[in-house]
């Protein structure tokens, strides 16, 4: 297996080597637990209650015997939360994308995908065998110009975008995209993994858009909702279709009931506490005040994803490792997660952070960045 050694050597030489880190005695400043619900007492208590009632796992796929009242109740809650008719659960965001996209388009169809979409979208498009065209990030003029010239060549067209982009934190213009879809008869697939609970209920709610039959809303339970798994929301017709066609749903064991119960409780907490989003914005501003003290090159779009741009892969890894020595973990994000030369430290805001935590972050940055140009 010499080839594996050689490939790993190449990865290390390019400063792209990855490894898992046990975060013991370290403060995490890059998790996706944006609202701090992962350890919320009510979420944990509800999960434990259902764990004792229903057991550890679901025991089967949804289409065999792994579909319980807890799955259905979560689906109903998600559909209501997203303003759609229906919903279906998936084992993860990756499984949702690689299962749903190939069910919607195939050979003879066209996918138009934003260049910064998540890797699971890229793989879902590959599996679909539809023709793919990647458009420049949020360049909707390019997108529309292509459709003007080429829409009639294809049977079905699916436009795909993250709503909040996972590595930059900026927001897609869903108003513009819905206008394009209506004018050129396209479906719109929005990935709301980092959107649900961070800018409101979701992108449609944020932009004041009523759900239409051509809009497919995908999201995860594992970010702001603090749980695990994913979902797709849409019309009842669409969901019935996915239950019959999405292979990653059909051939996967369903989520544990306790996970579903915890996610449902998290949504209820968000609904009961609308100011959580406002508190998150305040936490983001506190982080920005720290970053400003060090004249760092960062991006901020009023979402909890605040990447510190370093650009050079080797330097990004060095800063990450130095921060880790100080007890602060901010992951170095490099190619292929982001384009080459766009390496960054993916700092995120969370309601978990106390004033003491942010002071700790500030002191660590001061030590590590001292003397850096």
From Swiss-Prot:
Substrate binds at residues 18, 118, 337. Pathway: Cofactor biosynthesis; biotin biosynthesis. Its cofactor is pyridoxal 5'-phosphate. InterPro entries: Aminotrans_II_pyridoxalP_BS, Aminotransferase_I/II_large, AON_synthase_class-II, AONS_Archaea/Proteobacteria, PyrdxlP-dep_Trfase, PyrdxlP-dep_Trfase_major, PyrdxlP-dep_Trfase_small. It comes from the Bacteria. PANTHER family: 8-AMINO-7-OXONONANOATE SYNTHASE, CLASS II AMINOTRANSFERASE/8-AMINO-7-OXONONANOATE SYNTHASE. This is Putative 8-amino-7-oxononanoate synthase. It comes from Aquifex aeolicus (strain VF5).
């Amino acid at each position: 297996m010499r080839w594996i050694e050689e490939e790993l050597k190449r990865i290390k030489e390019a400063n792209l080597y990855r490894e898992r880190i046990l975060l013991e005695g370290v403060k995490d400043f890059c998790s996706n637990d944006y609202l701090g619900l992962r350890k919320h007492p009510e979420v944990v208590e509800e999960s434990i209650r259902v764990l004792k009632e229903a057991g550890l796992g679901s025991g089967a796929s949804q289409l065999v015997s792994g579909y319980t009242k807890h799955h259905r109740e979560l689906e109903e809650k998600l559909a209501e939360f997203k303003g759609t008719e229906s919903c279906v659960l998936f084992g993860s965001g990756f499984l949702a994308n690689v299962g749903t996209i190939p069910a919607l388009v195939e050979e003879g169809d066209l996918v138009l995908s934003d260049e910064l979409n998540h890797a699971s979208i890229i793989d879902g498009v590959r599996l679909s065998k539809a023709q793919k065209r990647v458009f420049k990030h949020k360049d909707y003029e390019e997108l529309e110009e292509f459709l003007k010239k080429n829409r009639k060549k294809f049977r079905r067209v699916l436009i795909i975008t993250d709503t909040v982009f996972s590595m930059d934190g900026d927001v897609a213009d869903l108003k513009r995209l819905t206008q394009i879809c209506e004018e050129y008869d396209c479906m719109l697939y929005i990935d709301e993994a980092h959107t649900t609970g961070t800018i409101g209920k979701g992108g449609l709610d944020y932009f004041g858009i009523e759900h239409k039959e051509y809009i497919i809303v995908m999201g995860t339970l594992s970010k702001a909702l603090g749980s695990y798994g994913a979902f797709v929301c849409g019309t009842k017709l669409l969901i019935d279709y996915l239950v019959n066609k999405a292979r990653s749903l059909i051939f996967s064991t369903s989520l544990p009931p306790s996970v579903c119960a915890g996610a449902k409780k998290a949504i209820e907490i968000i609904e009961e506490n609308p100011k959580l989003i406002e508190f998150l914005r305040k936490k983001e501003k506190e982080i920005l005040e720290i970053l400003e003290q060090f004249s760092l090159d960062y991006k901020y779009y009023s979402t909890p994803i605040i990447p510190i741009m370093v650009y050079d892969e080797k330097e990004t890894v060095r800063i990450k490792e130095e921060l880790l020595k100080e007890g602060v973990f901010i992951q170095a994000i490099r190619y292929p997660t982001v384009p080459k030369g766009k390496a960054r430290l993916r700092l995120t805001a969370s309601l978990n952070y106390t004033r003491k935590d942010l002071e700790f972050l500030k002191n660590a940055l001061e030590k590590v960045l001292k003397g850096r140009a």
